[in-house]
Amino acid sequence: MTLLSGANSVGYPSQMPAKRISWRRLVALLPNSIGLSLKPVTPHLRDLHLVQRRLQDDFLGCEALWTIFMAAAWSYRYRTRLRPFPSHWNTIDLVFNTLGDAPRLEVLQQQLMHCDYQACSPNVVRLLTDILVDQADRVSLSSLRPCEFQELYAHLGMSPPKQPPTQIFEVRTGKGNEKGEAYASLRQENKESVRLGFYGCKLEKVYALLNSQNSLDNGKYLELTCDINEALARSKPQAGVGGSRCGSILRCVAVVEFVFQDNETSRDKKQVIIKDANTMQVSYLLLYGQSCNEYAMERQIKLMAEPARELLNWLERYHKKAISLGVGLLIVSSMAHFGSTFFRLLARTGFYVFKRGIL
């Protein structure tokens, strides 16, 4: 109710008692030119509050989880990387369009702090809820402070890596995670066989590694190493999310706990092959983030120090492909006239690649 004072016009006493009029009646009496800011009811308001709470609890953990999801979704191998596929989405095209409309999490947090609940479309809210709330109830990431890194190394019984990570996240499994419950039961029965290993990989592989129960189907396996520096060398850099606190160029090393059950090992016992996903669990994630300028400078320094190292690394790592390439170049060169200087050079190159592949 609104209180209106008495009028002083002719015929109306100035000491008339105040008259009450309802708010609805007052709005009806106002001219149409005076607009009132009546905000519509925001859909998915409860979901936005849940997302806001997760961002407030651990912003870095949410951003890492969102970055890992985006890396898997944008991969051309999304069919194997994005597992399980978000339940409310039918096609990858719809996921792409929604990711294109989604704001940066830092911007979203500022909008929610100022009670701006109209900035995100319903699809964006639904996807944020799926990844940061529903999916995080099963597997979530908890960020560690830099001062806790040394304590973690001592707890795991490992030497600090030569290149310190920019962020470390503890992987936590929630209730209803069947994979986590199965591993916890196996771990309890085989406490003396529990081991730790390191797995360096591209960021797009981490989503399925954390969430999928069938990540090692169809003959797939993980090759773990006991040296974290070697694992980091195997991790290929991948573009992250622009403006992310995790970094623009990211490399990832997973600290994997597993139950040793007569697994295959290398001759020097430094690598272990894991073929059953139920016998392992990712305990921590180490992220190495760089800006684009830092990555370009590092790459330029490596190329200046060893100009041909990239080609030699490729030949050593993919010797089978090198043999195929060398044979192909030899065949192509043999089809031309022997007097051609170009094809002579091509033949010599093919023979060199072929020789390196065999060696």
Curated annotation (Swiss-Prot):
Coiled coil ranges = none
Q: Where found in the cell? A: Endoplasmic reticulum membrane
Highest taxon of the lineage: Eukaryota
Outcome of swapping residue 221 to A: Abolishes mono-ADP-ribosylation and Sec body formation
Question: Pfam family example for this protein?
Answer: ARTD15_N
Q: Give residue spans on the Cytoplasmic membrane side.
A: 1-324
Q: Which keywords are on file for this protein? A: Endoplasmic reticulum, Glycosyltransferase, Membrane, NAD, Nucleotidyltransferase, Stress response, Transferase, Transmembrane, Transmembrane helix
How changing residue 199 to A affects the protein? Abolishes Sec body formation
Keyword Nucleotide-binding appears in the UniProt entry: no
As for membrane topology, the entry says: Single-pass type IV membrane protein
Q: Which GO terms describe its cellular component?
A: endoplasmic reticulum membrane; endoplasmic reticulum tubular network; nuclear envelope
Under InterPro entries, the record lists: ARTD_PARP, PARP16_N
Q: Which GO terms describe its molecular function?
A: kinase binding; NAD+ poly-ADP-ribosyltransferase activity; NAD+-protein mono-ADP-ribosyltransferase activity; NAD+-protein-aspartate ADP-ribosyltransferase activity; NAD+-protein-glutamate ADP-ribosyltransferase activity; NAD+-protein-lysine ADP-ribosyltransferase activity; nucleotidyltransferase activity; protein serine/threonine kinase activator activity
Supply the EC number(s): 2.4.2.-
The job of this chain, per UniProt, is described as: Intracellular mono-ADP-ribosyltransferase that may play a role in different processes through the mono-ADP-ribosylation of proteins involved in those processes. Required for amino acid starvation-induced mono-ADP-ribosylation and subsequent formation of Sec bodies - which are stress assemblies that promote cell survival by preserving components of the ER exit sites (ERES) during amino-acid starvation. Catalyzes the mono-ADP-ribosylation of Sec16 which is essential for Sec body formation.
The UniProt comment on domains reads: The lumenal and transmembrane domains are necessary for mono-ADP-ribosylation and Sec body formation.
PANTHER family per record: POLY ADP-RIBOSE POLYMERASE FAMILY, MEMBER PARP
Supply the name of the protein.
Protein mono-ADP-ribosyltransferase Parp16
